[in-house]
Amino acid sequence: MSYQYSQEAKERISKLGQSEIVNFINEISPTLRRKAFGCLPKVPGFRAGHPTEIKEKQKRLIGYMFQSHPSSEERKAWKSFSLFWQFWAEEKIDKSFSMIDNLGLKENSGSIFIRELAKNFPKVARENIERLFIFSGFADDPDVINAFNLFPPAVVLARDIVVDTLPIRLDELEARISLIADNVEKKNNHIKELELKIDAFSERFDNYFNNEKSNLKIINELQSLINSETKQSDIANKSIDELYHFNEKNKQLILSLQEKLDFNALAMNDISEHEKLIKSMANEISELKNALTILCDNKRKNNELDYINELKKLTERIDTLEINTSQASKVSVTNRFTKFHEIAHYENYEYLSSSEDISNRISLNLQAVGLTKNSAETLARLTLATFVSGQIIQFSGSLADIIADAIAIAIGAPRYHIWRVPVGIISDMDSFDFIETIAESSRCLLLKGANLSAFEIYGAAIRDIVVQRQIHPTNYDHLALIATWKQGPATFPDGGMLAELGPVIDTDTLKMRGLSAILPQLKPGCLAKDKWTNIDGLQLDSVDDYVDELRALLDEAGFDGGTLWKRMVHIFYTSLIRVPNGNYIYDLYSVLSFYTLTWAKIKGGPVQKIEDIANRELKNYSAKISS
C-alpha cells in the first residue's frame, strides 16, 4: 500500500490550514485515533497514553507537516498522517478499504483511484469521496471531477435508501396498524365495562347524596374527635421527647455502669486467681513447717552440718513465701490495664461520617497545635488515607506526640487509649490484653514511644489486626491506630518493623505558624460509621493506571519490599487517591517519601535511588505546570 504524498498534495493540504487538519483528525473515532497516535514516537516528560501526551503528539505532527523545507521529520510526519487518512477512509467508506497496490504518484493516479473506489463502493456519498481525495497524497487531476460524478450526492443517497426501505417500512406500518386496531377494539370493550361501572356508581352516589345530612353530622363528629386526638397526640409527642432525652441520659449511665461491671468482672477473676495462689502458698508453707519440725527433731539427734544448712535454706524459703503471700493479697487486678490510659469525651463531640468532615476536623486540630493550614490539610489527607487502609499512621521528630494527640482527639471520641511503651518489653501479653478486653469499645489506640521496644515482640496482636485488615474485614475496623517514635540511643533505629505497617511523617519537616498567631481550640470528634472504609465522599474513579505507575517506579528503583508490604503500599496509595482534594503527583511523592523510603532503610534497599526518583517526578511535574 502506498503512503507517499506528492508535493502538490502537501501544498493542497497545507493551504487548508491547521484547524482544518485538526478537524479531519477529530472526525476519526477516539479508538482509532488513539491507535494512530500510539504509532508515533513517545514524547519525553509525558505519561504514555495520557490525553496531554496525545495532544502534544498532534501538535508536533502538524508542526512537522507544515515545515517549508524537506527533512526526515517532515517525511515521517506525512507518512504518519497517511495512517489517519486510512482510518478515516475505513470509517467513512468501508472497513475493507485499502489502497491499490503499485498505483504510484502518476498524474492520473487520483482519478484511477477514485474510479476504482466507484467499482468497489458505489454507494458512498460524493462528499465523502471528495474529502477523501482532498486529504490524500494524490496530485490534482482534471479527470478527477468526472470520477467524482460516479458517486451519488449524500442527498440522493439518502433518498435512495429511504426508497429502498419503503416496502419494509410499509409492512411494519401495516403490522402496527393491525395491532392498533386490536388495541382499539379492546379499549372499546373496556370503555363499555367502565360505562356499566359508572352507572352502578351513579346509582350508589345518589343513595349517598340522599343521606347528606346524616353524613355531615358524622363528619362533624369525626372532626371533633380528630381535634381531640390531635391534642392528645401533641401531649404524647411531648412525653416521647422527654422520654427520649431521659433515655439518652440512661444510655450514658448504663454504658458507664457496664464498663464498671466489665472491669469488676475482670477484677473478680483476677482476685480468684490470686486467692488460689495464696492457698497454694499457704499449703506449701504448711508442708515446709512440717519439714522444718522433722529437721529440728533430727538436729537434736544429730547435729551434723548438712542438717544445719538444710534448715537455713528452709527458713529462708518460708520467709520468702510469707512475704510473697502478703504482697499477693494486696495486688490489684487493675495493674494489668493501667498502662492503657483512657481519655474520655462523653460530651460536646461531633459525629463525623464523611471524608470531608473527618479531614476538616483533623486539619483544624492540627492547626490548633500550630501547623499552617496547608501542612495541616496535607497531613489530614495522609492520616485519613491510613485509617481507611487499616494501617498505622506514624510520626517522628520533636512534635510527634503533640500532633498524635491532636489527631486522636479529632476522631477518638467518646473514648480512646494511650499506651506509653516502656523500654525493653519482652512479652506480647499486654497487646493481647488490649485486643481482647478494650479494643472493641475503644475508638483509637495511640502508641507513644513505639520504637522503645521491639514492636515485633510486644505488638504482635496489633500487627495481626493490621495484616488481617489488608485481607478481610475484622471486628476492629473502627479502631484507628497511631504511633510516635522517640529519639535517642535507647530506641530502635528507623522504627524497626513498625515501618512496614504504615507511612512515617517527620514532624520537624512540617511548617508551623508564627508565635503571634491566634490558634483555634482542640475539638473532639467521633467516627459515625462502624468501619473507616464505609465513610461517605470517597472517590470511586479507577486508579489502576496510578498503581501501575507506582509499580513501574519501584521496579525502576530495583526495590522489593516483600509481598505484604507491596499489598499494603498499594492499598494505602489507592486510599490516598480516593480521598478528595488531592493531586496524584503529590500523592505519588508522599508514598515514595513517607512509606517506601522508611521501609527501604530497614530492608537495606536503594534509599538514594528511591529519593532521586521521587524528587525527579516532582520536578518534572513542576516544570510541566510552569511551562
Curated annotation (Swiss-Prot):
Its main location: cytoplasm. The keyword Cytoplasm applies. Disulfide bonds: none annotated. GO terms for cellular component: cytoplasm. Keywords: Antiviral defense, Cytoplasm. It is found in: Cytoplasm. Disruption phenotype: When this gene is missing the Druantia system does not confer resistance to SECphi27 in E.coli. One of its GO terms (biological process) is defense response to virus. Transmembrane segments: none annotated. Component of antiviral defense system Druantia type I, composed of DruA, DruB, DruC, DruD and DruE. Expression of Druantia in E.coli (strain MG1655) confers resistance to phage lambda, SECphi18, SECphi27 and T4. This is Druantia protein DruC. It comes from Escherichia coli (strain UMEA 4076-1).
